[in-house]
Regions:
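N-terminal, well-ordered alpha-helical segments
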Residues: 32-35, 54, 74
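Glycine-rich, flexible loop/turn motifs
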Residues: 1, 9, 18, 42, ...
């Protein structure tokens, strides 16, 4: 389950399928990633082909990321069985 979002446009897209405020063009891929994240019970469940799941380091240690589109990643934390602070960001 997804407990919280950092990105308002991403939350709106997840709740209503309104992609008008997303900063990336591939809304269909974002939707697939968010559905997988909502169904996951461990961060490692996001280690799916093509997503390049990885743990972050440095100031973002304890967070994880998957490829979304181009330089954009969906990043998230994890508490118990839930994703938290889900964000869409270009951190490169």
């Amino acid at each position: 389950m997804i407990r919280s979002f950092r990105d308002k446009a991403l939350r709106r897209f997840f709740q209503t399928a309104d992609a008008s405020k997303l900063s990336v063009p591939n809304a269909a891929r974002i939707a697939v990633i968010l559905r997988a994240l909502a169904a996951a019970t461990r961060p490692e469940h996001m280690n799916l082909p093509g997503l390049r799941f990885h743990a972050l380091s440095g100031k973002d240690k304890g967070r994880f990321a998957v490829d979304a589109s181009g330089n954009y990643r969906i990043t998230f934390g994890w508490i118990e069985n839930d994703a938290t602070d889900v964000d869409l960001e270009d951190y490169h």
